């Protein structure tokens, strides 16, 4: 009996719940991907006409991973269709979701793993990011660095973990905003990474250096030919407008928690990106994380939040893709804290524990239902959405 079969038999209930959740989430991500809005948005059409070949992508390498994947899929599906760019976004969003799920599996038990992933994946905020035919979903990929750095510290397969980390950094650097996360990770975990790399042969390290050099060469060449590419990568505007930046900074919490600016791409009317329950869990999660601020995971979550705020201040984006992961990490922390506090009050009462778990599960499912119906029913039938999504590819 191999080790995977043995692990499944020992903890089969956990795996069944996880597999069922995966099937449901895949269904949500792919449901009516091309037909929900009927036509495309102007921004989707503009991006669709950008970098239509790999040669053009080399000349303009911003968000290159998105365009390479999209163009490769387009070669397989000859008729021009809005499904192709949207499916490409879904693929990267699925990668974000996998990393989010994996990080939660390192930090929490099965109950919070399932509830936290469902809360994140069913969010209308996440669905708008994941299913729009724009490369915005890639800006949430910073959580991959969290996952890979944790894996590197724990695994015995140092070469494989190092290779995955190097490849990830090489591709993430093409995505606007990711350079801040990479630099922050190097400054914070540089000594720990050096210690991890000490167990790897110099030949393999040299190979990794050559590999990442090859991957980033098109980007370096593009920056050399056109220095403005660097501004786009970092988010720095060509002309600094302090008043505009302060306005962006002020609008971030307003848009997430209170009242969003009407935009058919990201929301219905002026509804905020978060619901009341998730907002409350976020506040509790910030408190809980502050209580455990010495833990690496607390520092990571606050670091992701800070860099998300920095980039979202520099760049106008109604979807705030770099904010969603840290916000939901705090929300999951809040849900976990609530359950832990309840369990501390009734440490030996299985009935009380069962009631608490059931109530929280019902709340999370209710929130998921609200967001799913909001995205799949209310949003596409909204007048502003219909007028905005009226372009043909």
Indicate where each model-derived feature is located.
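Membrane-interface transmembrane helices that cradle and orient dolichyl/undecaprenyl
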Residues: 105-111, 143-163, 171-172
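Loop-to-helix entry region of an early transmembrane alpha helix in multi-pass inner-membrane enzymes
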Residues: 64, 68, 78-95, 129, ...
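Signature aromatic-anchored transmembrane alpha helix within multi-pass, membrane-resident enzymes
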Residues: 335-375
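Transmembrane-helix motifs of polytopic, lipid-linked glycan transferases
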Residues: 87-107, 145, 281-288
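Short helix- or helix-capping micro-motifs
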Residues: 25, 116-121, 169, 173
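Transmembrane-lumen/periplasm boundary regions of multi-pass, lipid-linked membrane glycan transferases
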Residues: 31-36, 46-56, 76-78, 178-284, ...
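Membrane-interface alpha helices of multi-pass inner-membrane proteins
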Residues: 160-177, 308-311
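Hydrophobic/aromatic-rich transmembrane helices and adjacent perimembrane loops
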Residues: 129-130, 136, 299-346
């Amino acid at each position: 009996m191999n080790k995977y079969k043995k692990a499944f038999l020992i903890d089969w209930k956990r795996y069944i719940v996880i597999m069922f959740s995966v099937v449901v989430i895949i269904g949500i991500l792919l449901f009516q991907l091309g037909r929900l809005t009927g036509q495309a948005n102007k921004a989707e059409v503009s991006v669709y006409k950008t970098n239509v070949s790999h040669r053009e992508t080399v000349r303009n390498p911003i968000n290159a991973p998105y365009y390479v994947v999209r163009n490769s899929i387009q070669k397989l599906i000859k008729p021009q269709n809005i499904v192709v760019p949207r499916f490409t976004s879904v693929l990267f969003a699925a990668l974000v979701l996998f990393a989010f799920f994996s990080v939660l599996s390192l930090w929490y038990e099965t109950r919070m793993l399932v509830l936290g992933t469902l809360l994140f994946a069913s969010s209308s905020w996440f669905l708008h990011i994941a299913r729009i035919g724009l490369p915005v979903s890639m800006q949430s990929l910073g959580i991959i660095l969290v996952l890979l750095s944790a894996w590197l510290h724990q695994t015995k397969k140092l070469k494989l973990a190092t290779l995955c980390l190097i490849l990830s950094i090489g591709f993430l650097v093409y995505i606007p905003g990711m350079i801040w996360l990479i630099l922050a990770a190097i400054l914070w975990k540089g000594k720990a990474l050096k210690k991890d790399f000490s167990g790897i042969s110099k030949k393999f390290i040299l190979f990794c250096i050559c590999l990442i050099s090859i991957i980033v060469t098109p980007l370096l060449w593009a920056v050399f030919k056109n220095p403005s590419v660097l501004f786009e990568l970092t988010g720095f505007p060509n002309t600094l407008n302090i008043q505009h930046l302060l306005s962006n900074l002020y609008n971030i919490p307003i848009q997430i928690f209170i009242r969003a600016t009407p935009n058919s791409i990201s929301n219905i009317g002026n509804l905020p990106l978060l619901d009341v329950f998730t907002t409350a869990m976020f506040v509790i999660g910030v408190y809980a994380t502050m209580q455990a601020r010495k833990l690496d995971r607390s520092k990571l979550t606050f670091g992701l939040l800070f860099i998300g705020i920095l980039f979202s201040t520099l760049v106008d984006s109604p979807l705030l893709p770099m904010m969603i992961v840290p916000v939901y990490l705090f929300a999951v922390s809040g849900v976990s804290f609530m359950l832990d506090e309840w369990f501390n009050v009734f440490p030996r009462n299985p009935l009380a524990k069962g009631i608490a778990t059931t109530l929280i599960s019902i709340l999370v499912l209710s929130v998921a239902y609200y967001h799913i119906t909001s995205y799949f029913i209310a949003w596409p039938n909204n007048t502003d959405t219909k007028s905005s999504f009226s372009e043909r590819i």
